[in-house]
Amino acid sequence: DIACFAAWADRIFTVGPGAFYSAETFTDYPPGFMYVLYLIGALRSLLGIPYYSSLHIMLLKLPAILCDMACGCLLYKEATKRLHFSEIQSVCVACAYLFQPAIILNSSCWGQVDSVHTLVVILMGLFLMDGKMLPAYAIYGIGVLLKPQTLIFTPVLLVGILDHVFLQDFSWRKFFYN
């Protein structure tokens, strides 16, 4: 995928988002992630980074690595807040995620962007647990635009709506507001 990401980043920066999708070019990602690649293409062009150099590849992997780190931070925060873990226990939870070989290999080595999707799903779940419906809907929509695999979590969103809106003193207003 990293070779596709490199080509797509250059293409979307060169031709623009409006002309990016065409019959001549293989693109199997939705437009959300293409805007991330647009920024990478712009940075590469602005800084004169050689195509497919080590720095270019690092730039392409950076969104996934940053999302891995954000997931680790969220796990730390939630372990402390919701589970009432001690600071050291929360650090262990975050490290258990951040240093598992699958996470490191997937993002840092292979260059896959599954952690972008993972971060979106975690955020959606946290917003649903807090009864923050509009942010949950927005994050879900962004997730679908980033990776269509987010659709797999539609039942989670629907159960959150059912729980918050219909099972707790029904009100249509709660469909949109806390």
Predicted segments, located by residue:
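Extracytosolic helix-loop segments that constitute the early lumenal/periplasmic catalytic or substrate-binding loops
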Residues: 2-28, 32, 40-50
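Specific aromatic-rich, kink-prone transmembrane helix
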Residues: 74-77, 116-133
